[in-house]
């Protein structure tokens, strides 16, 4: 795939791949040294902390480099002569980002499993955690799309784009800690419309609570868990809206 080859030439792509190995490795070591040294806790960290704080902003930063690449190199006119529609250009770039997101999560899962074997931790729920790793890669890709849409809308303002990425990531991350946001029924509220709080409400039901505090929170929170079909449906609708907006913005951009 041409777009994948373009990504491979980017230094940020290599850096992102390194983080896909390093961050889960460090996180796994911290979990193992803590009180919750089980395979489920390791994967929870990789899916949530690594995904929410690292993967999502990386996807947007990769998008910044990817979507501005043709404009920076003045190759957009040549691409359109071939001909390749702007819609197909956008879709191909987003597919590459989706593949990267899934691979990022699978790499984290693999490192968690390898470290568990090294420290003789039982691989309980291996199949489920592998499926969740793939699913998390998909939903975090969807979570990044609203921010990518904003980045495209602001055109080639790299500094502003980075600021948007920082604010978007931090806002979503903080929100998923707020009980006032995540403990709400499905509806037109932040706990439903903001991607990370929604994803957290879906993911947490697969956690295995340890200790009285976690068990008490799990029981209170369980009333607001979001099923897999509902979570994916909401994110699918948001993704379609974002992609249509991207295509509209990209088509109006001067070459």
Name each model feature, range by range.
Residues 1, 67-80, 147-184:
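Cytoplasmic juxtamembrane interface segments
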Residues 1-17:
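Aromatic- and glycine-rich beta-strand/loop motifs that create alpha-glucan
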Residues 16-20, 93-94, 165-166, 235:
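Residue-level recognition of transmembrane alpha-helices
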Residues 21-64, 92-158, 224-228, 232:
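Secretory targeting signals
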Residues 34-42, 162, 166, 170-249:
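Terminal transmembrane helical anchor/hairpin motif
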Residues 66-98:
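Helix-loop-helix units of permease transmembrane domains in multi-pass membrane transporters
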Residues 249-255:
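Short cytosolic juxtamembrane segments of multi-pass membrane proteins
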